[in-house]
Amino acid sequence: VATMMGLGAFPADEENYIGMIGIFGQVCANQAVRDCDLLIAIGTRFNDRITCCFDKEKLAKKLIHVDIDAKEISKIIPTSVGIVGDAKQVLNELNNELNRYSFKDFSIWKNEAVTLKIKNVKPQKRTSVMHSFEVLKEIYNCIKDKNVTVSTEVGQHQVWTARYLKFNQPNKFITSGGLGTMGFG
C-alpha cells in the first residue's frame, strides 16, 4: 500500500500492490492495513488523512516505523519499533536479514488481497456523460508507456488523479500533500 505522497514508490501495476490508504484511498488498501499482522511504514508521517481510517492503538501494536527524521518516529502513532535511517539502506539491511529466515506460506493472504482489490473495482454504469474516472483512465492509457510527471492542485481532481492514475515510478506524481496549498500545480 502507499500514501498519496508515496504513490509510485512501489509500482501500482505490481500484483502485490493493493492501493492507496487513507480517507481518499481504496477500501481494499485500508482493510489490508487493518487486517495485517505487521505494518512496516517507511517515510510516512501518519497525517490525519491516513490515521482517521485506523484504530491507532491497534496499529501501534504491529507497527515498525522507518524514517530518516527521528522526530517523526512515534509522533502520531506510538511505534512498536522505530528505526531512524535512510529508507533504501534500511530496506536493504532488512532484506539481507530476512533472507536468513523461512516464513509461512502467504498464498492465502495474497489471494485475500487480490480478492479485496477485485471487489474494489466496481463496474460503473455507462451513461452519456463521461465521468472523471473514465477521463483519467483515458489519460492513463495515453501516458502509461511514456516518461510523464503529473502535477495537481488540491481538491477533488487531486483525489481522482491519485486514485485512478497508476504511478509505477517514484516522483511521477507531484502534489501538495501537507497544507493543501492552492496554486501548487
Where are these regions (language model features)?
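Predominant activation on well-ordered alpha-helical scaffold segments within soluble catalytic domains
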Residues: 1-2, 30, 88-95, 133-140, ...
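Glycine-rich, acidic loop regions that bind phosphate or pyrophosphate groups
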Residues: 6-110
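General beta-strand structural signal in soluble alpha/beta enzymes
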Residues: 1-3, 41-42, 85, 150-154, ...
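Active-site diphosphate/adenylate-binding microenvironment
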Residues: 112-185
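Conserved catalytic cysteine-centered active-site region
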Residues: 1-14, 166, 184
